[in-house]
Structure formats: C-alpha cells, structure tokens
Amino acid sequence: MDPKPTSMWSSIVKKDPPSKPPVNDGAPAAILGMVGNCKSTKGISIAVVDANAIIEGRQSLTNFADKFVTVPEVLSEIRDPASRRRLAFIPFTIDTMEPSPESLSKVIKFARATGDLQSLSDVDLKLIALSYTLEAQVYGTKNLRDVPPPIQTVRVKRLPEKDLPGWGSNVANLEEWEALENETEEKSNANSKILPLKDLNMNIIASDNVSEVGSVVSHTENHEEDVQEGGKKHRRYPPKKTEIKLEGKMVVEGVDASQGQYDDDDDASDWRPAVSRSTHSKYLRRKARWEHYNALAEQEIQKDQEADKARHTKEANETHAKDSGKNGEDISSILKDMRLEEESLRALQEETEETNAEATLINGEDDIDHDIEVEAEGIDVANQALENLEIASEAEDTFEASSIGDDGSSEQSWSLRALSESSVACITGDYAMQNVILQMGLRLLAPGGMQIRQLHRWILKCHACYTVTPEIGRIFCPKCGNGGTLRKVAVTIGANGAIIAACKPRITLRGTQYSIPMPKGGREAITKNLILREDQLPQKLLHPRTKKKASKPGDEYFVSDDVFLNHHSDRKAPLQPPVRKAMSVFSQKRNPNDNHYSRSMH
C-alpha cells in the first residue's frame, strides 16, 4: 500500500480554527481567578490597598484580608528607604492589577459629581476603579450607585440646640441623677442639717409669723378660689403692704409709724411720731385706703360664700329628686315584670300540664343559653377580627412610612449602605477617596481607624462676591471673574436634613500683594504674560473642538484637567497661556517675578 499522503497546506486551511476560551469583557483572567472563591474566614477575601495603608498598616494588614491587590503606581510611590524596607519584609504578597476602562470612567464621573475630582490623583482614581471592578465581578453593579444621592433642602426655622455638657439630659450618668432626684422628692431626712431648696424662703414670712431683726413681712390676704367658676368673676384685692421690723419698731415703706399704729396705751394717745405733717397725712390716707379695700374684699367674700351655699343646696335638691325618681321608676319596672311573668305562667298552665310545661321550660332555657353562647362567641370573633384588621392596617402604615423615609437619599442611609458585608474592600486613609467610596456603596477599611464621620458634597465659593458654583474645576469666578477667589467648601446634610454650607476663615493678605510685571509683546508673549481674568484665555482654549462627539448643554465648558493634561503629538507644541503658572500664583503665596532657576549673584 502506498503511504498516506502528507498533509498539504490547503487541508490545514480548510480545517476549523481552534475554539478560543470565552473572555469576559472588562475582566481579565487574573481577576476571574482571584474572585472565584469569595468565602473568607477573615470577612474580606480581596483588599485593594493604598500607599498610606501599606506604610501605616505594616504587618497588621495580614488580619484584614486573604489577598491584597493594588495598581503598579502605588508601589512606585513608596520611595523612602524605611518604607521600602518595610514593604520588602511584609509577610504577604501584593499583586498588581489594572482596572477596566468602564469602571474608571464611572469613577471619574462620580468623583466629579461629588466635587472630589480635583482632590484625587490618577492613582487614587485607579484604586477606586479597581475596587469597583472587583465588586462588579463578584456581586454585580446593582448595589452600587452611579450618581450620588440628591441633596434635599428642608427649611428649618430654628435648628434644635443640644444641651451643654453636664446640663439637662447631656450627662454621662443620667439615670443616677434621676434616681437621686426622685429619692429626694419622695422622702426627706428629718435629721439632716441641710435645708432643702423648697424651705429656703429668703427670710420672707407670712403675716401670722414674727421674724427676727432685718426680716421682711409681706401681708397678703389668702382667699379661697372657686375651682368651677375660676376666672369668670374678677375680684378686687387690697394692694400688698410691705413692713420691715427693725429692733421693735414697725417701719411702713420707710416711715417710723409704729407708735401711731400699734400703740394701745391710752396715756400715749396724744403722742405722734417724729415726722412731718405731710408724711403723717400720707400715712393716714394710706391707712384709710387700706381699710376701705379690706372692707370691700370682705363684702365680696361674703357674697361669694352665700352664692356658693345657695348653689350647693340647689344641686343637692336636684340630685335627691333624681334619685327618688329613679327609685320610683325601678319599683314600677319590677312590678310590671312580675305581672308579665304571672300572666305567662297562667297561660302555660292552661294549655299543657305541669310536667310538660316544666320540660318545655327546661328545653327552652337550654336553647336560650346555647343561643346566647353562640352569639357571644360570634361577637368575640368579630371583635378579634376587627383588632387584627386594625393591627394589620397599623403595620401597613408603619411599613409605608419606613419605606418612604428610607429612600436612600438621607445621610443615615448613606452610612448604612456603605457598611455592606461585601468581601471586596478598599483600605485607604485618604479622606477624598473615603468620601467617594462610601457614597458609591463600596466597602471601606481605614488603617488606624482614620475614617471620615460625615459624607460631604464639595462646591466652590467665591470669597469676593460670595457666589457658589458646583463646577469644581473652575479657576475663575463665573460672576466677578476674579482668579484664585474660589475656595472649596463642603455642603453637609445634617441629621435633620438641612443643608449646612461650611465657612472658612478669611484670607490673610500679608505676603500676597506685590507688583505685577509689565506685559510683553511678540509671538511668545502668550506664554509669558500673567493670566488674571478668564477673558484673557483664547476662545479655542475655552471651547476646544472635539471630533468624537458634540458638546452637550450640561457639559462643563471649562475644566482645568483638560488644560493641564492636554498633550500634543506634534514635533513642536503650540503656544499656550501659562495656566499652570496662574494656578500656582492663585493657590500659593508666590511672587511671579521670582525666578528660582536664575544663577546666584554671589
């Protein structure tokens, strides 16, 4: 037999190509193999670590997770010899990985919405995007937010103020203080030498008591008030009279009139106090007026007492008449019932015999009792059904209220959703990264417990004209046009839902005022002259043309990232204004005339 012919290249071409393994978009094979087993005894299977977590955590990171991943740029950020030595001797390995482009774009969009984009570096954005990628591969993106929750505005007339420390309910041992207060109110120690507060009367005594030297006596008439008709009738009372007893003499409003008022001796009736005639006449007029008021008050009290007695007697007579009428009605109803019973018994005796009558009566009573029991059971069942219906309706109301209240837009719900039980976490101490991670719904671990307590939304506020803009990437104020006056402030949602805009201290102008260099002309002048207003920038720089997509109305027309990260592949870069130099001048106390690269004159 002839040997088999050798395989020609045409036969190889005709064969079907070998099947390629399925590739998941946005997820490399390393990610799929790493997140294959999500079960972990430590609670976290994969942890995305930052440079500050590696430096601060050191060997304690071993107890946090089973595997550690990061981006390659994080390892290059650790430059000092001590940190490099610690990184070389850590008891675990840190794998490097790149996030997917889709997750990176979502993180950038989310950070721009929260106002943290300018505070995050490229490495920080990649770390958050890597956490987003791993979380999406394990649990999906349903539990993650694409847009931060909207800020709810609630108009509050007056914010509730907390009690000072140690006052009111703001004490550490409130229960002990309440128990002590209740104990002192219930029983008082008679043997104690310390008087309670209710017995401290500041030396003010009643008219029936006599105090020592220097005491003040206040004479007031105590009358009984009518409880039922209180406030309906206005009573006239004599004015209060204040007397001071000084060494046996009674002084009335600064006048020593004790002898003329309280001297009961007949021999001394001709004596008068050593005062002027006008003072004595004033005293007599006051005394007459006081006696007149007392007489009127006594007459009104007598009239009121007589009226009260008449009313009480009238009410007693009415109640007695009602009771007698009720007793008569009860007696008549009893007699009527007895007559009806006698007539029914007579009719039964005439129709049937005594035995049959007794049997029918017994059966009738049993049926009546049975019917009554059935009706009672039916009433109980109906009442129980109504109670169950009310309880169900209350439960539905509470469920609806709770579901409406927790709609995911409050600060409390942000914190609860952020503390998820995911097996993928990000370990970082950067506050801007923590703000974005918590609002997205990712799990966060802070090295050393350095974690933010409140979630913030950042805006820019001009300290020259107090204009607020949500465009966090702006350099110049959109209203007054000043550069460097936009300051980053936080818009916090408090516990009651009110928006609270943070305030920063005023800027110290010392060291910021200096002469500006003269503008220069020529082709390269655009790269040398300072930029102090937004209209100094060329139109093509403010509104760059893009061939990929048309600009939308909601897009930002000026972003500093586009200015700083605008790289060209041409041999000679076009001339552009020094926006970076303007930023350095606006953000720091730097003199633009100072040239750090000049040769020393010494």
Swiss-Prot record:
Subcellular location(s) per record: Nucleus; Nucleus, Nucleoplasm; Cytoplasm
ZnF (NOB1) ranges: 452-522
GO CC aspect terms: cytoplasm; nucleoplasm
Region (Disordered), start-end ranges: 1-25, 258-278, 301-331
GO molecular function list: RNA endonuclease activity; zinc ion binding
Cited InterPro entries: NOB1, Nob1_euk, NOB1_Zf-like_sf, NOB1_Zn-bd, Ribonuclease_PIN
Residues forming coiled coils: 331-365
Protein name in UniProt: RNA-binding NOB1-like protein
Organism: Arabidopsis thaliana (Mouse-ear cress)
Taxonomic lineage from the root: Eukaryota, Viridiplantae, Streptophyta, Embryophyta, Tracheophyta
Gene: NOB1
